[in-house]
């Protein structure tokens, strides 16, 4: 088993980002790889760190596009799973007038939410210096249980744990948000 500087777990999705306007004045959207945990891994790869991803995408064109993007970036896909029934999660990203971004998610459910505890390769965690995860993997079952179990495995293995809150309120059930 290889050793990794950082192993991240969470959402891997397609961000449809506005990229200009058509001749008719309609917005043109570009399909880009997205998801906070993988964005972190991509930057770490550029800094020369060895990384791996744990998560789930749909067995669809977008899922295959994301797998290819991870491989091209140098991120290990050993922990990437494919769901044959649920599609890859999509997000439409639009800029507001103040320059901030607005996200509309198509995730009811999305493949990232369907990662099960038994699909997580805990050897990846035990062979990492840092385990990084984001809040979206805590929004729904079964990925919530898979994430909590993986956090516990990292803690038991003495792996440093990094958390990105990245709160997207529309994705949380009211009963789950506690302040």
Residue ranges with predicted function:
Residues 1-76, 115:
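Glycine-rich phosphate/adenosyl-contacting loop at the front of the ribokinase-like
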Residues 1-7, 100-179:
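Ribokinase/PfkB-type carbohydrate-kinase core domain
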Residues 12-15, 19, 98, 111, ...:
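Active-site/binding-pocket entry motifs
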Residues 15-16, 23, 41-43, 97, ...:
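Short, flexible segments with low predicted structural confidence
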Residues 27, 71, 90, 148-150, ...:
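Residue-level signature of transmembrane alpha-helix interfaces in integral membrane proteins
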Residues 38, 81, 175-176:
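Generic recognition of cysteine residues
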Residues 50-135:
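Conserved N-terminal subdomain of the carbohydrate kinase-like
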């Amino acid at each position: 088993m290889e050793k990794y500087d950082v192993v991240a777990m969470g959402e891997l999705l397609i961000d449809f980002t506005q990229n200009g306007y058509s001749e008719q004045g309609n917005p043109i959207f570009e399909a880009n790889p997205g998801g906070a945990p993988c964005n972190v891994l991509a930057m770490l790869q550029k800094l020369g760190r060895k990384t791996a991803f744990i998560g789930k995408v749909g067995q669809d064109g977008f899922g295959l596009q994301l797998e290819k993007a991870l491989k091209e970036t140098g991120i290990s896909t050993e922990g990437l799973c494919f769901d044959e029934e649920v599609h890859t999660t999509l997000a439409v990203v639009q800029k507001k007038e103040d320059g901030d971004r607005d996200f509309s998610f198509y995730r009811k459910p999305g493949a990232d939410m369907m990662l099960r505890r038994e699909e997580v390769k805990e050897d990846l965690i035990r062979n990492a210096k840092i385990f990084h995860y984001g809040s979206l993997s805590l929004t729904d079952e079964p990925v919530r249980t898979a994430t909590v179990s993986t956090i516990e495995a990292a803690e038991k293995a003495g792996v440093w744990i990094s958390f990105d809150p990245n709160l997207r309120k529309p994705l949380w059930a009211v009963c789950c948000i506690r302040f």
